[in-house]
A protein has these predicted regions:
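Short beta-strand/turn micro-motifs at beta-sheet edges
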Residues: 1-4, 62-64
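N-terminal helix-turn-helix DNA-binding core of bacterial DNA-binding proteins
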Residues: 2-46
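Basic amphipathic alpha-helical segments that dock to polyanions
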Residues: 47-54
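Beta-hairpin "wing" of winged helix-turn-helix
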Residues: 55-71, 76
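Basic, amphipathic "hinge/linker" alpha-helix immediately C-terminal to the N-terminal HTH DNA-binding motif
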Residues: 70-89
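Amphipathic alpha-helical dimerization/coiled-coil segments
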Residues: 85-112
């Protein structure tokens, strides 16, 4: 998928991946890739800065955990993050409906 298509949608996708519960950064990357059948195989240099931005905005929070002797950060939605995800889903629904209607229209009405 072309990176420019992701612009403006990454935050909503990250919030959606965290909706079911906490995930560490690499698990977020895997969920995006697996949930999109490989179309969203994003580098850590894209995902981690976005996670940190969402945390600074108060939409997610993180906690350190130790697994098999290794420390890693687990991210999860806050109440504000859940509300933001709900709002972004509504906007996406409206946008995708309009774009689909335009792209699939055939034939276009004649203009005078």
């Amino acid at each position: 998928m072309r990176p420019e298509l992701l612009k403006g949608h990454l935050d909503a996708l990250l919030l959606a991946v965290l909706e079911d519960g906490p995930r560490h950064g690499y698990a977020v990357i895997e969920a995006l890739r697996d949930g999109s059948d490989g179309a969203l195989d994003l580098p850590t240099g894209t995902v981690y800065p976005a996670l940190h931005r969402l945390e600074r905005a108060g939409l997610i929070r993180s906690d350190w955990e130790t697994v098999s002797g290794r420390r890693r950060r687990a991210y999860q939605l806050t109440g504000s993050g859940r509300q933001a995800l709900s709002d972004q889903r509504a906007v996406w629904e409206q946008f995708s409906t309009a774009v689909t209607a335009l792209l699939m229209r055939n034939p276009w009405p004649a203009t005078t």
